């Protein structure tokens, strides 16, 4: 029971560090929540025009998921990895420090999956890349990768990891609900095109 609590709290707290907000403030750009979509993720940071800052946010958001999984694996054992992974993405998406208004968790999910079972993470990245090449829509590509992740996890890592991936997929779809509405309406912007509203991040 104590291990479960430790894995959950540790994963959540690491995941809840809002790197996009921290980096934009350190760079003198103000509050990222007042820019673009208001999201704290890398895509919204990119809207500031600072590509390096957006890349740093992407890597740190992915890294915190990987670190949460790695630490729990070493300290508490592999059986607690799915718990820590889910909690890390939960922390990113719903950080207590920001009134539970965070990002969409794509980068943190990928970092979590890469650390928990790297073939699953690579398969999801590959799915995103292929989908993006075909459809040219970032959010749709992320949703396809999320939807495929439980199957990848079941094949490469087993039922526990498939359950974690399914939970992450459900959470990811929920955080992308505005994107899904725009996709249905045919209003979601394409990669490289101009956008009027939020997409990823």
From Swiss-Prot:
GO terms for cellular component: plasma membrane. It comes from the Bacteria. It is a multi-pass membrane protein. Pathway: Lipid metabolism; phospholipid metabolism. It catalyses: an acyl phosphate + sn-glycerol 3-phosphate = a 1-acyl-sn-glycero-3-phosphate + phosphate. InterPro entries: G3P_acylTferase_PlsY. GO terms for molecular function: acyl-phosphate glycerol-3-phosphate acyltransferase activity. It is an enzyme of class 2 (transferase). Keywords: Cell inner membrane, Cell membrane, Lipid biosynthesis, Lipid metabolism, Membrane, Phospholipid biosynthesis, Phospholipid metabolism, Transferase, Transmembrane, Transmembrane helix. It is found in: Cell inner membrane. Signal peptide: none annotated. Probably interacts with PlsX. Belongs to the PlsY family. This is Glycerol-3-phosphate acyltransferase.
């Amino acid at each position: 029971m104590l291990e479960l609590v430790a894995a959950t709290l540790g994963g959540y707290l690491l995941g809840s560090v809002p790197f996009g907000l921290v980096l934009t403030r350190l760079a003198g750009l103000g509050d990222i929540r007042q820019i673009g979509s208001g999201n704290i993720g890398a895509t919204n940071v990119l809207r500031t025009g600072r590509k390096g800052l957006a890349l740093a946010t992407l890597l740190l958001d992915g890294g915190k998921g990987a670190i949460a999984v790695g630490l729990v694996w070493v300290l508490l054992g592999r059986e607690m990895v799915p718990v820590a992974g889910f909690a890390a993405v939960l922390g990113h998406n719903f950080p207590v420090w920001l009134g539970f208004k965070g990002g969409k968790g794509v980068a943190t999910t990928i970092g979590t999956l890469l650390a928990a079972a790297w073939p699953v993470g690579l398969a999801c990245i590959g799915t995103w890349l292929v989908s993006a090449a075909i459809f040219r829509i970032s959010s749709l590509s992320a949703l396809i990768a999320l939807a495929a992740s439980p199957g990848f996890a079941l094949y490469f890592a087993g039922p526990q990891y498939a359950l974690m991936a399914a939970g992450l997929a459900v959470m990811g779809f929920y955080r992308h609900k505005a994107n899904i509405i725009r996709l249905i309406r045919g209003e979601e912007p394409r990669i490289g095109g101009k956008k009027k509203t939020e997409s990823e991040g």
